[in-house]
Amino acid sequence: MARPVTRPSRRTLLIAVVVVGIGLSVPGANAVARSDASLSNATPERAPGAAEDAAVRAEATQLRARYHADPAALLASAQAALSAGRNDATIAFFLKRGWADRMNAALERYGAMLGSADTQTLALADAGIQHYATQLHASLMQSGPARLITISLRAQRLTAYDRGRVLVDALVTTGRPALATDVGAMRITRKDSPWTMQSPWPKGSPEWYPDTPVRMVLWFTENGEGLHDASWQPDATLGPGSQNGPYASHGCVHLPLAAVTTLFQWAPIGTPVVVYPGDGSAAATQVAQQTVDAAGNPLSGVRGD
């Protein structure tokens, strides 16, 4: 025989509502709710990694076809991009840009694949290297200082960027090996025009030089290193290798007059100046050659000319 249905009393309903309400308010329930929300929000965060991987693989297919699966051509393409990416990563590290860590790690991960003889692997390495090298440069231009001067010692080249746009691109001559231009992140500290360079070394010293007038100079250290014109040096002698030649400086950076004139008018005091090896080696190797302290003060002693 069926038992009669018993309806809950108002007191019972009230207790049930209170219990349910307490259950929904306890930390565990909220944690589950937050966890579900986090999972739904996490999907878009993972998507860029998958998208990047797909983009790299698609580019690898195109590169393999473009170079007709020639391993030498793929390797040359990858090595050029790897050098450029490492140099940009070095500048970013000197400027203490935290975003460079992930991109540089990915760049080196693909770079480690270049020892393979398999063309598919080489194509993937080339594509990955180019992808992250491009990202490094774009990020440096977009989130780096609005005004930035970089000097590559290997290329003997100065590049000045104004909000990511190249303003000056000029061949230079830096310090001779015995008085090499300092490496690291420095800044414009003073500007003078005209100026007469005076030797900090006594007459009779192998480093002595006579008083030398220049049209203008932008100092980037407190020990005598600056960017200036050099009327005694033909422009044709500027560029790669000139730091080992007869016109090599005592630590300063020689520039064509037109280039230094533009910089003098454009660069305010405080403009960052990054001098880096620029030899395409791993960023960690290049950063280890820094010769300035954390404040950008050179540790190398007096310089000049």
Label the predicted regions.
Residues 1-7:
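N-terminal secretory signal peptides that target proteins for export/translocation
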Residues 10-14:
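N-terminal export leaders
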Residues 17-21, 58, 62-75, 79-84, ...:
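Exported/periplasmic cell-wall-interacting domains
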Residues 21-32:
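Hydrophobic alpha-helical membrane-insertion segments, chiefly the h-region
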Residues 32-106, 125-129:
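Amphipathic alpha-helical assembly segments used for oligomerization, scaffolding, or translocation
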Residues 107, 111-148:
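Long amphipathic alpha-helical scaffold segments
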Residues 134-239, 264-265, 298-304:
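Gly/Pro-biased beta-strand-loop elements
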